[in-house]
Amino acid sequence: MNHSVFVILITITYFGLNQACIKNIVEILNQLAPGQILEYHCRSEDDNLGVKQLNFNATPFVIRFHDEIPNLTRWNCIFRQGPNNSYSYDIEVYKAGPRLIPRCGQLRVWAARIDGIYFARKYNTPLVRVLSWNKN
């Protein structure tokens, strides 16, 4: 009986929170240079968004999603740029560990610049360089 009550409480908590849970956001920016195109390929365990291109200072590419419970929600993106896409990096752009309560309203901003890849968790904070490009 106690086990059944626990399962019911977890189910109610999950569905109740998931209804009110604001989607998480991964935002990708091309801040390379005028005329420079950022090629990217984003995927999760359940979704493959395919290879896309983003022009310099174009509207950011946005991925909106809910965490999967109790599985590990993870998004990876390969960024490529430069002549013949000779610079690249495969980035884990979002990761939420296994949990019973989902994360809600998380933000991950990733910007490609000539000197590397920049990151922020809030809109009102400056982007910080966290990765250098790999030369293929």
Curated annotation (Swiss-Prot):
Glycans are attached at N71, N84. GO terms for cellular component: extracellular region. Residues 1-20 form the signal peptide. It is found in: Secreted. Keywords: Glycoprotein, Secreted, Self-incompatibility, Signal. InterPro entries: Self-incomp_S1. One of its GO terms (biological process) is rejection of self pollen. Pfam families: Self-incomp_S1. It comes from the Eukaryota. Belongs to the plant self-incompatibility (S1) protein family. PANTHER family: PTHR31232, S-PROTEIN HOMOLOG-RELATED. This is S-protein homolog 25. It comes from Arabidopsis thaliana (Mouse-ear cress). The lineage of its organism: Eukaryota, Viridiplantae, Streptophyta, Embryophyta, Tracheophyta.
